[in-house]
Amino acid sequence: MACFSNETQIEIDVHDLVEAPIRYDSIESIYSIPSSALCCVNAVGSHSLMSKKVKAQKLPMIEQFEIEGSGVSASDDCCRSDDYKLRIQRPEIVRVYYRRRKRPLRECLLDQAVAVKTESVELDEIDCFEEKKRRKIGNCELVKSGMESIGLRRCKENNAFSGNKQNGSSRRKGSSSKNQDKATLASRSAKKWVRLSYDGVDPTSFIGLQCKVFWPLDALWYEGSIVGYSAERKRYTVKYRDGCDEDIVFDREMIKFLVSREEMELLHLKFCTSNVTVDGRDYDEMVVLAATLDECQDFEPGDIVWAKLAGHAMWPAVIVDESIIGERKGLNNKVSGGGSLLVQFFGTHDFARIKVKQAISFIKGLLSPSHLKCKQPRFEEGMQEAKMYLKAHRLPERMSQLQKGADSVDSDMANSTEEGNSGGDLLNDGEVWLRPTEHVDFRHIIGDLLIINLGKVVTDSQFFKDENHIWPEGYTAMRKFTSLTDHSASALYKMEVLRDAETKTHPLFIVTADSGEQFKGPTPSACWNKIYNRIKKVQNSDSPNILGEELNGSGTDMFGLSNPEVIKLVQDLSKSRPSSHVSMCKNSLGRHQNQPTGYRPVRVDWKDLDKCNVCHMDEEYENNLFLQCDKCRMMVHAKCYGELEPCDGALWLCNLCRPGAPDMPPRCCLCPVVGGAMKPTTDGRWAHLACAIWIPETCLSDVKKMEPIDGVNKVSKDRWKLMCTICGVSYGACIQCSNNSCRVAYHPLCARAAGLCVELENDMSVEGEEADQCIRMLSFCKRHRQTSTACLGSEDRIKSATHKTSEYLPPPNPSGCARTEPYNCFGRRGRKEPEALAAASSKRLFVENQPYVIGGYSRLEFSTYKSIHGSKVSQMNTPSNILSMAEKYRYMRETYRKRLAFGKSGIHGFGIFAKLPHRAGDMMIEYTGELVRPSIADKREQLIYNSMVGAGTYMFRIDDERVIDATRTGSIAHLINHSCVPNCYSRVITVNGDEHIIIFAKRHIPKWEELTYDYRFFSIGERLSCSCGFPGCRGVVNDTEAEEQHAKICVPRCDLIDWTAE
């Protein structure tokens, strides 16, 4: 093995095998030195060697060790030559490893001296099941060169079979060979993950094999199987376990196969012999290629180096000639404090000026861990481009074009107003980093059509395609056609497909003549018809039909979009896009990703579907009713979403569910949260309304329609650089904690999901004549947020432990009567003394939920209840054709008896249970009863219901004028108990002009779970205890927040008048 280091250098002349020195030699002749030519070249304090350049030959020398007892002499005459003078230093050998005398000698003295760490490797790295690779102690590791040193191998063999004795004990002969025999006797039918070679193998042999593909962005292996192969495209189809399909090229991916040796022999497969790292780079080959380059003391243009910029990892780059930069701003500034180098990075193709000390040779960087410190996909591309440069000494086409067109790029960037640093980014210590923004043309000639750029397939609008053609955004082509001024001459026309800046969803076709005149239209034919009409006017009267046939071509044909080759290219462009949201996260080598940098979708499981998705409030008003999307079931206020007309039970869909919405759900440009109430922005993107409300720089152009969202481009640059502390995604704009001394950042919707947002705080201190209310939006991090009584989900519900009967002591009877006590007429619904409440609370500890199910003659015991839970009853899903509120209401009335059942509740009395699973947003049941006035309801409660001992009062207040009395009439909905953490909520809906109180599912409700909702009992003088048993229980049924707000008098200052004494 060859090892290189900068610590110690010695000069060694190689054995002269030819009469004249040669510049390049076979790598095998260099590393395959006879054992008689081994030299002892150990130095004190280091065992890593590096050879200097000998004349024109610059090849790395392998490290040799002198082994005691091996019979190898360093003073052999074969090492001498007339052309090369051998200077051998024989320093004293330093023992770097020591063992106690009583312990047996290790298997190999060489391993004893330099190998102390052993780790197992996979089958794909070497063609052996139980082989071990050894790591050397020191500042640098042994670098594999693709072949083992013959000299070191012979040393190991001599030590293994020499039978040397130490301390009276001899090693058993052939022990290593026996261990190797055991390793080779592994089961031939056992399957292991291996890497296979693709050279000389039938492509169909891989079909049916189980594989796993490495995704660099996720740093994970995803398992699947090979299900097909396209010979025309030379791509394999991989079907992952999650059901996603993807077409990949084996040479561009990191793939392992689960096969056995028998299957490999049957399918004629071979192991991958090259040493490939986890990043997919052929490390050994790059080391050999870099070692064959001449290493000079000074760097010259064209040399490949490792360059270091402040704040970035070591990156492969090529030194660029100073003459190509011209008048480029930023790069023509010399770095102070020494010499500088102008480099261009592989992969990113950026230009930079760095100091000389910040660049090291490529071979030194490979031998150090520089290539292992970066896992970015661009770095992988850069390493592949660097490898191709080492092989063919030719730069990638884009790098060459950027170097040749440096002047044009510089002029474009100098005139750009988007770059705030005159085309360059200034770094520390005078470094300059320039990112080229010029798009490199993709040139493809088809007949007289020159395609410059294929563009990209648009997925967020359905207007960029029709039944026969696809119009990629950014498509650019050129062709020669009859001139506008002279029909006998030809002119060059440039054709482009862009996005209309006004509609943001429709394409705009532009044809530019050589004179600079542009013809725009919504279709290709609209543009070319204008050109045809112009040419016809210029034609002479004596030859009107000369160009008649040429002027009849369709606009699509002139653009080239109807050409079969162009159609195939566009189809391949659309097929190259991943087919699922999981595949969209992948960023492989050689692929261009449409996802913005740092983006990762965040999905929030909202627990409060009864609240508005915009303002996050659950109050509903007469002039601001709730609207629920009949497709995605999102809940918003009508005014919060900009809906001016009531739907009255008709079908209502949000912007993303309506016909004409984007095919793929758009992502918010302000946060990575998926879904929610979104509106278009003025620049053609989408954003959440909640994000636009919380971010200070954004606003709404039309407050009534709540769209479009404006000010996205005015958001502070520092806000885009913040990383959310909740989701950990660096994409989007973040807000910070409202505490003056806190700088914790998070996305608005992430903070809302975590309970960090204080939605509204009224500020009535208005100045001047305007009386508009100002609302402060406050949010606090976990450290500074106020103590909240927010309840946990139903999965965190705590079941009370059942007490033993012997531990229960009944309260003392103050009257002394052993049987009864007088009825307390001042109490409501029976006894309200503390003793009675304590007895009732203790009694509930023994109560279990027991739904009433008709099942013949059988006792409903606890075991029967468990069997009900375990029974497999098919879930009743709402039919997909039912969308409108009226249809859902009709379906709920017809099926609620099949879906719900009453029974004994563990909370209080009887309750309602779900016989089938329900989804969030489903209509559960309607609360029906007798509609009375509030005054009638109060009299009935005081005069009739309070005198009925053991009976409950079931009143549902709709508003200040209407109350539903379900005590003696109505459905079983009045049996639904209260809970501080409910799984349902109540809403008033309007169907065909009539109002109905509906109980909706707030979340997914499993089978046989009890239905609960928040009563929000409002009473200033009376308190009702709660027995829901949740950790966040308020302790009372009363709506404490509403009572506190009612106790405060809040009046705007504009409504106040000066008091004058009468």
Swiss-Prot record:
Region of interest called Disordered, as start-end residue ranges on this chain: 159-184, 401-424
Residues in Post-SET domain copies: 1022-1038
Location of the FYR C-terminal domain: 504-586
ZnF segments: Phorbol-ester/DAG-type: 591-647
Annotated Gene Ontology cellular component terms: chromatin; cytoplasm; nucleus; perinuclear region of cytoplasm; plasma membrane; Set1C/COMPASS complex
GO terms of biological process kind: abscisic acid-activated signaling pathway; actin cytoskeleton organization; chromatin remodeling; epigenetic regulation of gene expression; methylation; negative regulation of flower development; peptidyl-lysine methylation; quiescent center organization
E.C. no: 2.1.1.354, 2.1.1.-
Domain SET, first and last residues per copy: 898-1016
Post-translational modification remark: Activated via O-glycosylation by SEC; this modification triggers FLC locus H3K4me3 histone modification, thus preventing premature flowering.
Molecular function via GO: chromatin binding; histone H3K4 trimethyltransferase activity; phosphatidylinositol-5-phosphate binding; protein methyltransferase activity; transcription cis-regulatory region binding; zinc ion binding
Region (Interaction with PIP5): 599-1062
Keywords annotated in UniProt: Abscisic acid signaling pathway, Chromatin regulator, Cytoplasm, Glycoprotein, Metal-binding, Methyltransferase, Nucleus, Repeat, S-adenosyl-L-methionine, Stress response, Transcription, Transcription regulation, Transferase, Zinc, Zinc-finger
Binding site for Zn(2+): 980, 1026, 1028, 1033
ZnF region ranges: PHD-type: 609-660, 722-785
Residues of this chain annotated as glycosylated in UniProt: 947
PWWP domain boundaries: 301-365
Residues reported to bind S-adenosyl-L-methionine: 908, 954, 977-978
Pfam families (UniProt xref): FYRC, FYRN, PHD_2, PWWP, SET, zf-HC5HC2H_2
Family membership noted in the UniProt record: Belongs to the class V-like SAM-binding methyltransferase superfamily. Histone-lysine methyltransferase family. TRX/MLL subfamily.
Protein known as: Histone H3-lysine(4) N-trimethyltransferase ATX1
The species this protein was found in: Arabidopsis thaliana
